[in-house]
């Protein structure tokens, strides 16, 4: 059975924290690859102004293109409405019955697991992998595999705020992503 990691998110923008988490879990669990799963509309972010799918996808491609064990999975982008992990993983497990999926989540999402849509059924489809995130614990009533990663306190919301305030984001996200953001005037207001 193949072992594949999945890291979902809006990736608005993708940053070194996402890449660090994916790479650390890839090595710690001896995965075949890690798939980045950009959301259409995450249920917990409905109503927030999210950068276009096209721009988020382009930035994610730029961020991951140099790692042969990273891929982008477009499963959620093909659907309209909220992106529920259960629906996505049900589709992916049907398409790839030979794969054991390891769904990678940060401490913020570990704490939120009791509120996830169809969590009990989702546990039959994936192994959750929790990684520590500053300010959050990995305590949950659900079974998760934990992977220790070096602390890197950066988030997409922090980066959007820094761009809005015209502060440097150098060394926080890949240079190609920075160039794309600046050329397209993203996060300026």
Curated annotation (Swiss-Prot):
GN (gene name): nadD
Entry's Gene Ontology BP terms: NAD biosynthetic process
HAMAP family the UniProt entry points to: NaMN_adenylyltr
Chain's role: Catalyzes the reversible adenylation of nicotinate mononucleotide (NaMN) to nicotinic acid adenine dinucleotide (NaAD).
Family the UniProt entry places it in: Belongs to the NadD family.
Pathway annotation from the record: Cofactor biosynthesis; NAD(+) biosynthesis; deamido-NAD(+) from nicotinate D-ribonucleotide: step 1/1
Originating species: Bacillus cereus (strain ATCC 10987 / NRS 248)
Catalytic activity, EC: 2.7.7.18
Family annotation (Pfam families): CTP_transf_like (PF01467)
Gene Ontology MF term list: ATP binding; nicotinate-nucleotide adenylyltransferase activity
Sorted UniProt keywords: ATP-binding, NAD, Nucleotide-binding, Nucleotidyltransferase, Pyridine nucleotide biosynthesis, Transferase
InterPro entries referenced in this protein's UniProt entry, alphabetically: Cyt_trans-like (IPR004821), NadD/NMNAT (IPR005248), Rossmann-like_a/b/a_fold (IPR014729)
Stated name of the protein: Probable nicotinate-nucleotide adenylyltransferase
Reaction(s) the record says it catalyses: nicotinate beta-D-ribonucleotide + ATP + H(+) = deamido-NAD(+) + diphosphate
Source species, domain of life: Bacteria
């Amino acid at each position: 059975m193949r072992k594949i990691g999945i890291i979902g998110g809006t990736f608005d923008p993708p940053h070194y924290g996402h890449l660090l988490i994916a790479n650390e879990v890839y090595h710690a669990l001896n995965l075949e690859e890690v798939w980045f799963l950009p959301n259409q509309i995450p249920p917990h972010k409905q109503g927030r102004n999210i950068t276009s799918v096209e721009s988020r996808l382009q930035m994610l491609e730029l961020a991951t293109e140099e790692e042969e064990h990273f891929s982008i999975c477009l499963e959620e982008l093909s659907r309209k409405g909220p992106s529920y992990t259960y629906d996505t993983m049900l589709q992916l497990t049907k398409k790839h019955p030979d794969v054991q999926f390891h769904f990678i989540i940060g401490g913020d999402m570990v704490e939120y697991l009791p509120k996830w849509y169809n969590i009990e059924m989702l546990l039959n489809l994936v192994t959750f992998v929790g990684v520590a995130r500053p300010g959050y614990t990995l305590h949950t009533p659900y079974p998760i595999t934990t992977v220790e990663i070096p602390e890197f306190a950066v988030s997409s919301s922090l980066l959007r705020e820094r761009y809005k305030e015209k502060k440097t984001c150098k060394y926080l996200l890949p240079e190609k992503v920075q160039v794309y953001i600046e050329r397209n005037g993203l996060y300026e207001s």
